[in-house]
Regions:
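Short N-terminal helix-loop-first-beta-strand/juxtamembrane motif that initiates sensory/input modules
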Residues: 42-44, 140-154
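Short, basic and Ser/Thr-rich N-terminal targeting/leader segments
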Residues: 57-59, 143-145, 388
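Beta-lactam-recognizing serine transpeptidase/beta-lactamase-like catalytic domain environment
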Residues: 97-108, 149, 153-198, 203-437
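Small/polar-residue-rich segments within soluble enzyme cores
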Residues: 1-116, 433
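A short acidic/glycine-rich loop-to-helix N-cap element
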Residues: 435-448
Length: 448
């Protein structure tokens, strides 16, 4: 008990059972094994086995996933590519008597073990290190319920980094606490939906422009609220933005502008675009546990619902779904599929690889170019200027959304986020950073 740190009573109960053998401990170190033998205890032996060891501990926990105690993948890449990663055990075939004793050891036949295959990923350890540092800083600064960040190449969907808090060391999986294990091992980026708030306005803008229902020269008037179906819906700026053009509406994130955009398109046209962006179904990312966004049935949508959807309310999306769909807005209008696997190899032979063939066109290249210009203004002089870095071309949109509990708005609880894109030679990355329930007064996405 002293060697392994186990409770005396439960260990005594385990070894007192009437059975031929009992496993007392697994993954025993050489130091622990030496202490056992030095104690002179009789009837104790060990067997060697192979198991997963993660040299970087809690690095990439959610995306890598973990294995069961017998080596089978349970979550993340470990589960999704288990059929490739798991090898075949070796065997010795011999003739035995009725009680299982070998009759002729010389006539045994050995079947050698077959090693598992190698899965090459799109993950970048350098970018992952930066992201994990940023997540730790956000945890220390905002004391939130959770933090998540994903970085993806918006030109082809290759995921470069994914990090979430809370997390755990993959070498010390909390198997004894199933609630903790479930909450800390699942990827919220893949499996959890949330109300995106103003980051959703990227899609509304692109759809409105591409449909021809809105032009960049159109002017709008924001009085601080808009009445739809007899209900007053407020802009975040209580005094209103006044008379502004479309570009100023995007730059200042005016809710009234995006309500009008959605209403001009109408439910069917707007929903057709959202479907084309891929938001109404799973992205197809090669990780376990993915879910799809939640939308009101288009046949049940009222104008007041449509207006709210326009600025990111009355809708729920997954982070991976939002990043994938907005990537189409930035990359020239082509739909991408998020993925982590680059290729599967056996020695030098490629068994499987991810096809980078072009996806469906969602919006025109002209609309995409216009959106890039507008979103650069958001970062340069608008609501996202906190993300501005001199010498770099950065596009983006902030988001602050209220949370709901039991169907009601949870007062004082917010999800703050920033959705940004870098535009440079060889580094076309989209980044979605989410802070769940930041504490204190700094809860707006523009501050977080």
């Amino acid at each position: 008990c002293d060697v392994f740190g186990y409770p005396y009573d439960s260990t005594l109960e385990k070894i007192s059972k009437r059975t031929s053998e009992v496993t007392v401990a697994t993954k025993v170190t050489k130091e622990q094994l030496n202490r056992i033998y030095e104690s002179g205890l009789k009837g104790i032996y060990y067997s060697e086995d192979n198991y997963r060891y993660y040299p970087y501990g809690d690095f990439m926990t959610q995306v890598l996933g973990f294995c069961s105690s017998d080596g089978f993948g349970q979550t993340g890449l470990e589960a999704y590519y288990d059929k490739y990663l798991t090898g075949v055990n070796g065997k010795i075939l011999t003739e035995t008597d009725l009680v299982g004793r070998s009759l002729d050891k010389e006539s045994g036949y050995y079947l050698p073990a077959v090693a598992g295959l190698d899965v090459k990923t799109t993950l970048d350890a350098g970018i992952q290190s930066i992201v994990e540092g940023a997540v730790r800083n956000a945890v220390a600064k905002f004391n939130p319920k959770g933090v998540a960040c994903i970085v993806m190449d918006y030109s082809n969907g290759g995921i470069a980094a994914l990090c979430e808090y809370p997390s755990f060391d993959l070498n010390n999986v909390p198997r004894d606490d199933l609630t903790l294990l479930f909450e800390s091992s699942k990827s919220r980026i893949i499996s959890t939906v949330y109300e995106p708030g103003s980051t959703f306005k990227i899609l509304t803008s692109a759809a409105a422009l591409d449909s021809g229902k809105v032009r960049t020269s159109d002017r709008f008037y924001c009085a601080g609220s808009k009445v739809v179906d007899g209900k007053k819906i407020r802009c975040w700026k209580a005094k209103g933005h006044g008379s502004i053009d479309f570009g100023q509406g995007v730059e200042g994130s005016c809710n009234c502008v995006f309500m009008e955009c959605a209403l001009r398109m109408g439910t069917n046209s707007f929903y057709d675009y959202l479907s084309a962006f891929g938001l109404t179904r799973k992205t197809g990312v090669d990780m376990t546990g993915e879910t799809s966004g939640i939308f009101i049935d288009r046949n049940l949508v009222k104008n007041v619902d449509l207006a709210r959807i326009g600025f990111g309310q009355a809708v729920a999306v997954t982070p991976i779904g939002l990043l994938a769909s907005t990537s189409s807005v930035i990359n020239g209008g082509i739909k991408v599929t998020p993925h982590v696997m680059s290729e599967v190899k056996s020695n030098s032979q490629t068994i499987a690889s991810y096809s980078l063939s072009g996806g469906d066109r969602v919006i025109s290249e002209s609309t995409s170019n216009t959106m890039r210009e507008l979103l650069q203004r958001v970062v340069t002089t608008g609501s996202g200027k906190g993300a501005y870095v001199a010498g770099y071309k950065i596009l983006g949109k902030t988001g602050t959304a209220q949370k709901y509990e039991n169907g009601q708005i949870a007062r004082g609880k917010y999800i703050s986020s920033f959705l940004g894109f870098s535009v440079s030679e060889g580094a076309n990355y989209g980044v979605l950073f989410i802070v769940d329930e930041p504490q204190g007064y700094m809860y707006y996405g523009s501050l977080v």
